UniProtKB/Swiss-Prot annotation:
One of its GO terms (biological process) is aromatic amino acid family biosynthetic process. Pathway: Metabolic intermediate biosynthesis; chorismate biosynthesis; chorismate from D-erythrose 4-phosphate and phosphoenolpyruvate: step 4/7. GO terms for molecular function: NADP binding; shikimate 3-dehydrogenase (NADP+) activity. It comes from Histophilus somni (strain 2336) (Haemophilus somnus). It comes from the Bacteria. This is Shikimate dehydrogenase (NADP(+)). NADP(+) binds at G126, A127, G128, G129, A130, N149, R150, T151, F152, S153, R154, M213, G238.
Amino acid sequence: MDKYAVWGNPIAQSKSPQLHRYFAKQTRQNLDYVAILGDEEKFEQQLSDFFAQGAKGCNITAPFKERAFKLAQQHSKRCLSAESCNTLKKLADGTLFADNTDGAGLVSDLQRLNWLKPNQRILILGAGGATKGVLLPLLQAQQNILITNRTFSRAEDLAHKFNQFGTIEALDLKHIPIQTFDLIINATSTGLQGKTIDINPQILQLASAVYDMQYSKESDTPFIALCKKQGVTKISDGFGMLVGQAAHAFYLWRGVMPEIDPLFSGNEIKI
């Protein structure tokens, strides 16, 4: 049986094992997928041992995405632009191929929601790894991107790095123009600490739609709660992105794209 896993620290909260087992059953693929707690000091050796024991691939989550990127011998274009990976595949020659399916997962979810049309103005909150992982696919989807961040220089650096791929610019968080954005995406990690980014509430009130990359099964994320308080009605959390990135990783490994619609049409599985 082919072996796969997701690596992270912490890892107990990961929904990847449930998703990939569901995909395997749906597509009749014979595989085993588990969650593994990575050791921050020994991660590289752990991963090397994992593949030496015959594993076919794995997913990578925080805090190991950049370290896994450096271990791979080959990389997809979107992975190179992100400078981090969330998916590794062992090739026939024994080398590791790295991909980053986060952006593909986001784009596929925005398409599912019918929120993605050419030449929209999308404001992204945050200039960290989560943003870097989705910029290329969004720009390839002909979106006009504006990035804002608590540290403006980080937003400027990202805009400069990605302007070769499309229309992108940085905005000072304290001086975002009061105007309607087609979509606001929260890519900050503030929600993990129960906080929200310090943004002018008028910006949220005028937004056509808002999307939080974070996902919480138990309750609204802090960002979504804030948006609801400001009267925003067109809102989505990151569950669909989670499902989408997993589906694209599964396709990379197995050559078959799982059907994800059943996950949004009822409680077919517990995620």
